[in-house]
Amino acid sequence: MVALMRGVEALNKRVMTSGIELGRVVDVILDEAGERPVGFDVLCGDGSHRFLPFPTARLEGEHVEVDSSLLLLEREQLDFYRKHGRPLRA
């Protein structure tokens, strides 16, 4: 339940690495049971949606911090997790 609450808290927050904004969390992807977040749908500055795995993100006040932009996975991975999980906003 704590993980789910942390996932919900990340909605609409900026995703940043070393002070650089990479995008914004637009949805939380939950596991198949809808109980735990597995990652985030991030709308990036280039207009593309990418998948950010939940364990790689740190909620820090008003933003989500990641160690590297390489942690944002391509659309294919986002589609996989959407298909095998549940979007919070669905």
Regions found by a protein language model. Give the residues of each.
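Peripheral interaction segments used for macromolecular assembly
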Residues: 1-90
